[in-house]
Design a protein with these regions (language model features):
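Walker A/P-loop
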Residues: 13-14
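Conserved phosphate-donor/acceptor-positioning beta-strand/loop module used by diverse small-molecule
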Residues: 89-93, 102-125
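Hydrophobic anchor at the beta1->P-loop junction of P-loop NTPases
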Residues: 5
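Small-molecule kinase domains that catalyze NTP-dependent phosphoryl transfer to phosphate-bearing small molecules
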Residues: 129-178
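P-loop (Walker A) phosphate-binding loop of NTP-binding proteins
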Residues: 8
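Post-Walker A helix-loop "phosphate-sensing" segment adjacent to the P-loop in P-loop NTPases
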Residues: 22-30
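ATP-dependent small-molecule kinase phosphotransfer cores
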Residues: 33-88, 94
Length: 186
């Protein structure tokens, strides 16, 4: 199964990805990134960091399932992981939902909405970004949140929509949902 976690920056996608791997039989899809590493990020743990040229070589070798540009960098995913028979989990940008449904029609998507958008913005501010990038992310959070809140067609593209109140109850609800999805698979 391929499970995608979707939501605004700061909603907890990385946190929940770790919890899903910790609690269930899932492995993380390694997101390839051409952007510079942020403070605290490690190659192989926070994703795979490479140059655009290195990524281009993987594409020429036919090893990339999908790539897209966002936030001034290119993000890509390896075919071996995207088409694996194993349970795999990754973070997906909401604008790529239609592409992913074509690549893996059986993909399961969980859209995580923050109960309080200000908490998501605050978490984005704590990411050690340049002031310019921070402002770009805050604008993107607002734009993304407004779009998902008002666009019913967009919301309907996701299999599940859950709320994160950044508390234990929200965590339990999201993990229970993953368990239910897994139970349906078997």
């Amino acid at each position: 199964m391929l499970l995608a976690l979707v939501g605004v920056t700061g909603v907890g996608k990385s946190y929940f990805k770790e919890k899903i791997v910790e609690n269930f039989d899932f492995e993380k899809v390694n997101t390839i990134r051409t952007r510079a590493k942020r403070i605290g990020e490690e190659d192989g743990k926070s994703g795979i960091f490479m140059t655009k040229e290195e990524l281009e070589n993987l594409k020429l070798q036919g090893k990339i399932a999908y790539n897209f540009d966002v936030f001034g960098g290119t993000y890509a995913y390896l075919k071996d992981e995207i088409f694996s028979e194993k349970n795999m989990v990754f973070e997906m940008h909401y604008t790529t939902i239609e592409d992913w449904k074509k690549i893996r029609p059986d993909i399961k998507t969980i859209y995580i909405l923050p109960n309080d958008i200000e908490i998501a913005k605050e978490k984005a501010r704590k990411r050690n970004l340049s002031k310019e990038k921070e402002l770009e992310r805050i604008r993107e959070i607002e734009e993304h949140y407004n779009r998902i809140s008002t666009d019913e067609n967009l919301r309907n593209m996701f299999d599940y929509i859950v709320y994160n109140n950044y508390d234990e109850k929200s965590e339990k609800e999201i993990l229970m949902l993953v368990k239910e999805i897994l139970d349906k698979k078997y």
